[in-house]
Every structure is written in structure tokens, then in C-alpha cells.
């Protein structure tokens, strides 16, 4: 009997004394047998970030269930919390020169290392197969969806999303009239990126200060049906697109912290991404706007197309990697067709009609030695908007937009302009008034004059 007791005690783990579990010793023993660290609010293993702690808790339970102790669920919770302290590392920066895949690591120079020996921030659920056949179905789909000169831009952008880097400082919007099949791209990308991709909303990101924290550790955020409303704020969106290091993140009910942000933004929409107040060049310069072809009237849609294209994911990986290598060779400058550039300019002009006003005829004239007061210029602008059925900007917005356009149109904003009353006011050098909307007694009065019937011939 004594020998059996001694044998059972000898077989017991070091963290169990026969009556209770030593949680600290269990953590040391568990971490000694598993590659796992904790940083930036998440566990990381050789398979990437642990997105769900349930499998980890299940593995701990399998080791604890042999010990007849009470309240095992609480023990497991205590162990997980203790493990966060025991496995804590100060920092775990992203590695932008490699792509961790299901069977190894692919480097930007094209070399490949098999196996998963190291703990990584993210790992894509795709096998690297250099002999994978070309994704013919995927390429045929893109050929029917986009213009041929725009496909390299999409190829580079998808490749750009494979690495945790924001050096390209661009987001992408693919717009169409509906029914073209744009959303099929998102379905295929979910198979390529797995848990490293998230469905989100650019509108939510722009207005919710907690939304950025949801994109931590994510490579790609896809807005499958972007809202048509103009963004009231653009600073959150711009900060994500241009982030090249840690940024301030905030979760509800918790103190803000510094976290790595590498998420790229891809949106599908029936319209343009507009800003309600931000008319700066920077907001529009960061957009790659692709236009989908119109859907052929005789096209028959395949409901299983996405699943068929997902079967080509190994070939799609090679296709995207070729785009990434091309982007890196161009120093992260995207290939843009003339159509893409014109799309971006059209979006910018649609949200800021000041450019069209400055280039109009019959209202003002660009002349180097001329000048106009800000008030007179705005009155002429309102007249131009009224006669062209356009919505006029507010006075301050108009002035700010005109100041921003000074460099492009060789204008100068100064306070040395003399108005009709002889007072020195703010205005612009380089603009001459052609129309005179204030010749009537009332600025908003109609240009037509009412004539009583008795006076008519």
C-alpha cells in the first residue's frame, strides 16, 4: 500500500502536491513545453496570434483534469491570467521583410524557409507552392471586372497587404453601379488572409475612437458595402493609412495605449469616399480609386464562383507576391493608370467645386496683376453656384479651399487688398472680377426686374 502511494506521488506533476495545484509552477511547466508569448494584449505562438483563447483553455483543462480538485474553471482562468504575466515580453515588432505561411516563411527576395520554428505575429493559412498552377479562374474574373490597365494596381495592393507595413500609404476603393461582382474579391481574400483580415466599416472607423483598436494585429480591413455618407472626420482614417509605427489606441473602459497598426483599408462601393469638411489634398491623395466595368446584360452569374476561386488560393498567393515584389522594386509607389488618376481628381473636384469655379469663364479671370477681396470673391462664387445648380460652400470653407489652391493657380492670399469702400481687407492677388453680383440693392435678389402690368406695352 505504501509502495502504491509512493509510486502515485512520483508520477504526479511537480505543480500538484496531491491536494492543490500550484498555479505558478504550472505556468512554468506549461511555458517550458510550449512556445508562447504575451504582448500587446494577445498571446502569440508559431502559428501567429491566438484569436480565441478557448483552445488554450481546453489544453490546460486536459492537463488539470487528472487532478481531483474543485472549481477547475476558476483555476484555468487564474492560470491564463498568470500566464499573461509569466509569458510577457516588452515588445514584439512586426517583420516587414517576410511572409509567414502555413508551411514556412517566404522572404521578399523570393527565398523560402520550411517549418515554423519561431513565434510570429501573423501566419497566413496558405501553403507556399512554387509550382502552383496559374489562377486562371481568378484572372478571368478580374479581366471581366476591371479594366486591364487597373489590374496591376489591384495586384500590387493585395501583395502590399501580405506584409505588416504601411510604407505605401494608400487605401483602395473599388466602385461600380452594383451587380458587377466586386464583393467576390473580399470572399477570396478571406481565404488568403484568414484571421488576419477583418470585415469592418470605414464610416465606423472615422467616427468611433474605439474602432482603431479593433484593427490591431490585422493586415487587411475590408468594407464590403461602404456607406455613401461623407465622413465628418477623416483624421482616424488618415492615421491608419499612414501609420508607420505604434499609434495611440483606446478600448472602451480602458486606458489608451501604444500599439502596432499595420491594417490596410479596402472598400467596395457604389460611390466615392468623400469628406464633409476635409478638402485637403492629403485625404484624396491617399486613395486608389478603381472603376469596375459595367455588367454585361447577357452575363449569367455563377453562385459558386467564390468557392471555385478559393481553390486557386495557392496560385493567387504567387500572383499577389509578384505584385508585392514589383511594388517594393518601385519603392512602394503604386502603378496607376490614367483612369485611376482621373478618378481621384474627379472625386476631389466633386467634393470641392472651388477648382471648377477658378477655371470657369464669365465670372472671374486669373490675372497676375489683379486683385479681389475675399467678400467679393465669395459673392461671385455664390452666383456661379446658383446659376449652375451647385451647393455653395460656407464662407470659411470656401476661403480655406481657395487658400489651399493658391499654389496650383499662382494666387496669393494677403490682407493688403483695398475694397470699394477704401478699406484694407483680406483677399487674393491674381484674380480679377468679371461678374458683379452686388450691383443690385439686395445680393440675393433675382437678376430679373418685376414690371407692373400697367407699365407694360
Residue positions per predicted region:
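Replication-associated primase and helicase/ATPase modules
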Residues: 1-34, 44, 49-52, 128-144, ...
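Intein modules and their embedded homing endonuclease domains
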Residues: 2-128, 260, 285, 373, ...
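A short, contiguous, amphipathic alpha-helix enriched in charged residues
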Residues: 20-25, 190-195, 230-247, 399-400
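P-loop NTPase catalytic core of nucleic-acid-dependent motor ATPases
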Residues: 31-56, 99-100, 105-219, 288-291, ...
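Positively charged interface segments
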Residues: 77, 193-195, 200-209, 231, ...
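Loop/turn-to-beta-strand initiation segments
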Residues: 217-220, 261-265
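Conserved AAA+/SF3 P-loop NTPase catalytic/coupling segment centered on the Walker-B
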Residues: 219-242, 257, 276-283
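Phosphate-handling catalytic cores of nucleic-acid transaction enzymes
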Residues: 310-352
Amino acid at each position: 500500500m505504501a509502495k502504491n502511494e509512493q509510486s502515485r506521488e512520483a508520477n504526479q506533476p511537480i505543480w500538484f502536491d496531491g491536494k492543490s495545484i500550484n498555479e505558478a509552477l504550472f505556468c512554468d511547466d506549461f511555458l517550458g513545453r510550449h512556445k508562447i508569448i504575451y504582448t500587446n494584449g494577445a498571446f502569440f505562438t508559431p502559428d501567429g496570434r491566438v484569436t480565441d483563447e478557448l483552445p488554450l483553455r481546453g489544453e490546460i483543462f486536459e492537463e488539470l483534469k487528472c487532478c481531483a480538485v474543485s472549481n477547475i474553471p476558476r483555476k484555468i482562468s487564474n492560470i491564463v491570467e498568470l500566464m499573461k504575466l509569466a509569458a510577457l515580453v516588452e515588445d514584439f515588432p512586426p517583420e516587414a521583410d517576410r511572409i509567414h505561411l502555413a508551411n514556412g516563411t517566404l522572404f521578399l527576395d523570393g527565398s523560402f524557409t520550411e517549418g515554423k520554428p519561431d513565434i510570429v505575429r501573423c501566419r497566413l493559412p496558405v501553403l507556399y507552392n512554387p509550382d502552383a498552377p496559374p489562377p486562371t479562374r481568378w484572372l478571368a474574373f478580374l479581366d471581366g471586372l476591371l479594366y486591364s490597365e487597373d489590374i496591376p494596381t489591384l495586384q500590387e495592393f493585395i501583395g502590399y497587404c501580405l506584409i505588416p507595413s504601411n510604407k505605401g500609404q494608400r487605401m483602395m476603393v473599388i466602385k461600380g453601379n452594383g451587380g458587377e461582382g466586386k464583393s467576390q474579391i473580399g470572399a477570396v481574400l478571406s481565404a488568403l488572409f484568414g484571421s488576419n483580415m477583418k470585415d469592418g466599416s470605414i464610416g465606423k472607423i472615422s467616427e468611433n475612437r474605439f474602432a482603431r483598436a479593433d484593427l490591431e494585429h490585422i493586415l487587411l480591413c475590408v468594407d464590403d458595402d461602404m456607406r455613401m455618407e461623407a465622413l465628418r472626420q477623416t483624421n482616424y482614417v488618415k492615421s491608419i493609412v499612414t501609420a508607420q509605427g505604434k499609434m495611440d489606441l483606446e478600448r472602451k473602459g480602458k486606458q489608451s495605449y501604444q500599439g502596432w497598426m499595420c491594417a490596410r483599408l479596402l472598400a467596395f462601393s457604389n460611390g466615392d469616399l468623400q469628406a464633409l469638411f476635409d478638402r485637403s489634398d492629403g485625404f484624396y491623395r491617399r486613395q486608389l480609386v478603381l472603376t469596375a466595368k459595367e455588367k454585361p446584360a447577357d452575363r449569367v452569374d455563377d453562385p459558386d464562383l467564390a468557392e471555385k476561386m478559393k481553390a486557386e488560393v495557392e496560385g493567387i498567393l504567387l500572383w499577389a507576391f509578384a505584385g508585392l515584389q514589383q511594388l517594393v522594386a518601385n519603392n512602394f509607389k503604386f502603378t496607376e493608370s490614367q483612369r485611376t488618376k482621373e478618378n481621384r481628381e474627379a472625386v476631389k473636384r466633386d467634393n470641392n467645386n472651388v477648382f471648377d469655379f477658378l477655371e470657369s469663364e464669365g465670372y472671374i479671370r486669373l490675372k497676375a496683376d489683379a486683385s479681389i477681396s475675399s467678400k467679393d470673391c465669395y459673392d461671385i462664387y455664390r452666383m456661379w453656384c446658383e446659376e449652375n445648380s451647385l451647393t455653395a460652400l460656407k464662407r470659411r470653407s470656401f476661403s480655406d479651399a481657395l487658400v489651399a489652391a493658391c499654389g496650383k493657380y499662382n494666387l496669393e492670399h494677403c490682407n493688403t487688398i483695398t475694397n470699394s469702400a477704401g478699406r484694407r481687407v483680406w483677399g487674393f492677388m491674381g484674380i480679377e472680377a468679371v461678374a458683379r453680383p452686388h450691383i443690385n440693392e439686395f445680393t440675393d435678389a433675382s437678376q430679373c426686374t418685376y414690371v407692373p402690368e400697367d407699365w407694360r406695352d
